Amino acid sequence: MLAGYLGFEAYAPWHAWGTVARVASEPTGDRPISGDGHTYLLVGSDSREDLTPAERKRLGTGSDPGRRTDTIIVVHVPSGDGKSTLISIPRDSYLPIPGHGHNKVNAAFAIGGPVLLVETLEQATGLRIDGYLEIGFGGFSRVVDALGGVDICVKFDMVDPKANINLKKGCQTLSGPQALGFVRSRYTDPRGDIGRAERQRQFLGAIMKKAAQPATVLNPVSWWRTTHAAVAGLIIGEDTSLLDAGRVALTLRGVSSGDTLSLVVPLKDTNATTAAGSSVLWDDAAAGQLFTMLRNGDPLESPPAGTDGKPSG
């Protein structure tokens, strides 16, 4: 009986992984050489493609077609000492888009999908991206509901009709629709997109903390439901493996425990006027130093200077 139970525990994620959608994500041509550890790109998209009309109404997502980047996070897992790292990339970051001049980084995804987004960030960071994972609105909400809600501490009252939420300050359990609004809202946060990126990393960590609890893992029904909900709205790179996804999941889990550093790429200006409109400019010197440390395997035990989202300019 024990062998059968353990077999089921292993079979559930393996079976779920076999149903996940795959997409081309690896650029061709010159790419950065592989550095220390493993680096992944985690993208939250505003795709409504897997939502029914009833779900779109419940989640307050509207019905815009296509997929745009709503969240961009570089995940780095070192091979040796030091903590794993999540680095939020503001979607309004003004960067060179290979073959398309300078633009906001989310334009790379709109123009050339995952391949061009990966290429853009590889050139901007000097890190070779080893895997790609993308989740849409529906997948995110379903995972939270499959877990029976996720506990989070809301730092201020959040009333945002555009994100379909009305939350009071304080610790509480959020449902799928509430969680989606919590990570989407940018107009209620005095820090704008930077504060929103912090909430996204915070909530991803809370999801993985809940998913790893014995009540989830040791309950066959809950474990099956959670693993399959997790991949229902997931899109991965063609060469991204289950092991890669496991590394990302463990890194996210470490946010709540402090084992993972939760950072923002160093910034110079969060409201710069560019040809693309109001944009975010990186602090190139500080960002370059951060990415060089990751590439070389220099251990990170605490957040480097300039990674708190406060502009240096």
At which residue positions do the language-model features occur?
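Non-catalytic, solvent-exposed segments at the cell envelope interface
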Residues: 2-313
